[in-house]
A protein has these predicted regions:
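Short helix/strand-bridging catalytic loops that position acidic/His residues to coordinate divalent metals
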Residues: 117-121, 233-242
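C-terminal soluble interaction/assembly domains
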Residues: 242-248
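Intrinsically disordered, low-complexity N-proximal targeting/linker segments that flank membranes
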Residues: 137-237
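Acidic, glycine- and histidine-enriched catalytic cores of nucleic acid- and nucleotide-handling enzymes
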Residues: 1
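A cross-family structural signal marking well-folded subdomains
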Residues: 6, 11-182
Length: 248
């Protein structure tokens, strides 16, 4: 970052403005740091995604600057997209999970234009949005970006790069790529059992609901404790019920 900071004041200013714009825009509302934008940019120019000084050569920085207008637009459209399918700042437990989505929307062409230019048009790309959101919920639930994120981003990029002629986001290919590894996206019985332990207020709740009920309105606001008020399960309340039940 310090290379960009000192030698490219214009890009530094652009990054700061993008952070502010995404955070303050009601259609997005996510706080994204500069480092994330730079890592994403390295991903989009098909460079080494590891955040090291040697990866920010003048050539790499030049490519980012040359494509910055398109990169910036794609990033914003991606955050609008994930917000619309129900992800908010609390449920976005891995910002690295957004990077492959940005890559696909940037590289995939539809009718001669990058997919990010039309992904948020409601009369288009319904199936595409459905497949990408399914992958995203799976990734958040499985937490596969918790370690070795750079290696994972690189290998997912390889799968997507070889799938740009596919009709839709290569969900099945990505699942196949990681079968049997510690990044396996499949849900076995043991893992499904563990999902029952997701607690009230946990960021993964939303992702689980969407996988269970794909027809659910992504923008619906749920009041989780309406069925059984949460405060009725506090120790104090339960002791009160026990006292009433056992009173003579």
């Amino acid at each position: 970052w310090h290379i960009v900071n000192h030698s490219e004041p214009k890009l530094r200013k652009e990054l700061d403005e993008l952070t502010k714009n995404i955070y303050q825009n009601n259609e997005m509302g996510f706080y994204i740091e500069r480092d994330w934008f730079l890592k994403t940019s390295l991903m989009l120019i098909d460079s080494d995604v590891r955040f090291k000084v040697k990866n920010f050569t003048s050539e790499e920085v030049g490519k980012i600057q040359q494509q910055w207008s398109e990169i910036k637009s794609c990033i914003k459209e991606t955050f609008i997209f994930i917000r619309r399918f129900g992800i908010n700042p609390q449920s976005l437990i891995s910002k690295n999970a957004v990077i492959p989505v940005v890559y696909w929307l940037y590289k995939k062409q539809t009718s001669g234009h990058p997919l990010y230019t039309t992904i948020n048009l409601l009369n288009k790309n319904h199936n595409e949005r459905s497949v990408i959101s399914q992958w995203f919920y799976m990734v958040l639930l499985k937490g596969i970006f918790g370690s070795q994120a750079d290696a994972l981003l690189t290998s997912i990029r390889d799968v997507m790069k070889n799938s740009l002629s596919d009709i839709h986001f290569p969900l099945e290919k990505i699942i196949d790529r990681y079968k049997g590894s510690n990044k396996d996206l499949r849900f076995d019985d043991e893992y499904i059992e563990s999902l029952l332990n997701i607690r009230y207020g946990e960021g993964r709740c939303r992702a689980l609901l969407h996988l269970l009920f794909p027809e659910m309105n992504p923008t619906e606001v749920f009041h989780i404790d309406h069925l059984h008020p949460r405060n009725h399960f506090s120790k104090k309340y339960l002791e009160k019920l026990d006292y009433i039940a056992n009173s003579p």
